[in-house]
């Protein structure tokens, strides 16, 4: 049985001028592909994330072929060798595996002589086909799900939505990538972030730990920009870079010959912000949800002479943006509670942040929002500035919005929605200026002098000071959080032990 798209009675095709692809919805595309995955593949041998990744590879090849076949001046020069897709549909077994391996190696080559392949170079970088024993399933994916349809006719927004939905459905696999600390950021949160940051069409937005690229997509959609250099990201996980590049391509509709929007890089080793190589323009906005912890990668920032102290991943990413952004740039950085009240490096960075930036807003996020992480999260909003000549702090007031107390969420049964942050956005943007903000039960102002008066300049603040036990989460989540804190403590003790003579 072939699982196609569109209505079997032809109604959708007739309504769309004989092309059913024009009426496809993102949810429908994702559902059909997951049905194929569950019924036509070995789900034990192929993870959901591997399935989505290979769907992305094959869709790239098919779209490139279709664009090259357009009539006259509408045709695009193919990035992939001409005739690749038709030949691929006739292969199976060893021949299919070998051809795909050769293609991935060729397209993933970062050859400077082929600037039109910069995006392909990232989509296929270090990519490998499924195991040889899985080629029958891959051949069916090609011949039953991808080849029969004209994917360039699918509305661009729906195609992008389908890929984003499928990535979201891979949350279990992504959360297992504990070696690089990956997680998925709910779109309603990102929607609120870009509104509060006031992202504009002329902005250049970066994410130095971009994961699947969702932050950049949210910014791009809010900007409605036509400039391909408007967004740029980096990640140290090659698989995430491949997925993020494809995710951005499908959500923005950019030509495959454009410069790559994402690069494979360890941002913390670089003393410069993420920029697009084709433009070199410095960013005006940064949005970052960095790894909160990692079991396989130690923060490598010890060679940074522009760092004041060396801490965990979120502390180092916060510091990286503080020192590399140009004056006037705006930022929103996700941080766990420990960065808000921890001593040592975290306290040093907090004091420097208050001194050199206008740290104007802290959003305490609902508990349970990030899948299986067991940590409480926050977002710090700040604007980079130049130091005051009299050594006073640039920050005058820190406004704290408490969206956490009494608001426990999960990413599946009770996910956050945009309505959860409507009041936050309204409170932040009231009057069009920070000076026009007013306090409420959930929104409170803290003068910077009060923050600095504390020995550690703690940001462990609440807008609603009433004790509320409902925001602690379930016993399982509390236990997970304790385990995370113990892991962090063990890491610090190991560092102390190694430093002792």
What are these regions (language model features)?
Residues 50-53, 58-59, 64, 160-168, ...:
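S-adenosyl-L-methionine
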Residues 2-22, 269-270, 274-501:
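A conserved structural/catalytic subdomain of Rossmann-like adenosyl-cofactor enzymes
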Residues 37, 55-65, 104, 108, ...:
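Short, amphipathic alpha-helical segments that act as regulatory/interfacial helices
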Residues 25-34, 163-168, 296:
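Active-site-adjacent bridging/hinge elements
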Residues 179-285, 293-297, 304, 311, ...:
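Conserved S-adenosyl-L-methionine
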